[in-house]
Amino acid sequence: MLKYIPAIFAIILSSNIAIASKNYDYISLTPLRHVADLIDSHITNIDHLFNNRLTFYESSSLKSKFITKDKQYIIVMEVPGFDKSQIKVKLNGKKLFIAGNIEDKNKANDSDNYMNKNFNYVISLYEDVDQKSISARLKNGILTIILPRIEVKEQDSREITIN
């Protein structure tokens, strides 16, 4: 049953995104809200069944900010409970990959407990990011990624005649 929780959770997130969209009128949202409420109540019941061990459901996504300044972009993410060894920041082309994973297998009092907490973000970088100077730091559960900006030369443009 636990392997279906992320899929169910993704459905809830999709429903919330659809509800927030301006393209939907209020009347058409009623079925989506009903489905989201049903799924939410079932997950709450499952959580009670497992003695409130499904804490990952409560913290659905990480809080993050993207800040634009004159000389740099700054990504700030709240990643409570993660340490440096559990977070990877990789650059591949013009994409920045940020991933975190915690696995905790605990055997105590004749019961097996297992906890897995993870996140994955992919960010497409602007042309003016100095990819060689990107840095990251983790302090007090806050991951800060600094993306220095460089001046990008405008490409020469010319008009092409049509024959």
UniProtKB/Swiss-Prot annotation:
| SUPFAM superfamilies xrefs | HSP20-like chaperones
Gene (UniProt): hspC1
Gene3D superfamilies, sorted: 2.60.40.790
The UniProt entry's coiled-coil ranges are none
Task: Give every sHSP domain span.
Answer: 55-163
What PROSITE patterns would the database entry show? SHSP
**Which organism was this protein described from?**
Rickettsia prowazekii (strain Madrid E)
Query: Can you name this protein?
Result: Small heat shock protein C1
Q: Which family does it belong to?
A: Belongs to the small heat shock protein (HSP20) family.
